[in-house]
């Protein structure tokens, strides 16, 4: 099999696919996000448990993904504490394809590059106040370059087709990110990431986050990660810590 390359935990997907005939589970064991107060002083907290991306290798350079989000909870806190609400349930089902144009089998020496494309669609499951109520989708274009034997840079641009808050139409949101990854030892690595989202309908403006984390790979098919994203702009979540697990079979 090829080198173990999970997409998590950063927001930047990589261009590499899972080997044909193999399955990879990438899970958020726990994921928490805390928003900044909006114009009305409302704060939103989100709790995710067991959100899992199932990646299935189809051919040498193609895979299918199914993002399952069974246990999500949202707490909305208003200025009046008595008005605090809780909503809980499954989120949307995301179905994704990934195609590697090149680099799957040649990303070994410094200077090597890889390129892929990742189209996806979000399908509402239940109307419970947690997930979206409309079909949405988009496409990612991930790129990676190997800087040295221990470091690589991953870049991604994404176009999201999002349902308008008002009316029946859709608009395009633009997500871009870059993640610098460094191998500390044969089992431990880390990353630093900058991500932006513009074209969103939030009156506070665009979203900018900085993320970092620590990754532990006890063997060539398992990864445990812990980290957090930190919001820079007013529209960004204030903090987003997480703990995750990836396993390849």
Where are these regions (language model features)?
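Transmembrane beta-barrel domains of Gram-negative outer membranes and organellar outer membranes
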Residues: 1-249
């Amino acid at each position: 099999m090829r080198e173990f390359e999970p997409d998590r935990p950063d927001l930047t997907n990589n261009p590499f696919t899972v080997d044909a005939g193999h399955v990879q589970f990438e899970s958020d064991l726990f994921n928490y996000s805390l928003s900044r107060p909006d114009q009305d002083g409302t704060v939103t907290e989100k709790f995710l448990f067991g959100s899992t991306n199932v990646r299935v290798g189809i051919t040498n350079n193609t895979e299918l993904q199914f993002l399952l989000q069974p246990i999500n909870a949202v707490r909305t806190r208003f200025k009046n504490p008595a008005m605090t609400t809780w909503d809980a349930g499954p989120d949307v089902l995301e179905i994704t394809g990934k195609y590697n144009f090149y680099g799957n089998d040649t990303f070994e020496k410094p200077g090597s590059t890889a390129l892929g494309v990742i189209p996806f669609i979000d399908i509402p499951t239940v109307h419970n106040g947690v997930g979206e109520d409309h079909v949405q989708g988009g496409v990612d274009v991930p790129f990676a370059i190997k800087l040295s034997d221990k470091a690589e840079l991953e870049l991604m641009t994404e176009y999201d087709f999002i349902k308008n808050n008002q009316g029946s139409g859709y608009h395009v949101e633009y997500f871009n990110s870059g993640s610098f990854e460094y191998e500390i030892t044969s089992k431990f690595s880390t990353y630093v990431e900058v991500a932006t989202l513009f074209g969103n309908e939030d009156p506070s403006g665009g979203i900018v986050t900085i993320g970092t984390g620590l990754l532990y790979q006890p063997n060539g098919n398992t990864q445990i990660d812990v980290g957090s994203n930190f919001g820079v702009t007013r529209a960004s979540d204030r903090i987003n810590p997480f703990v995750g697990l990836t396993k390849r079979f």
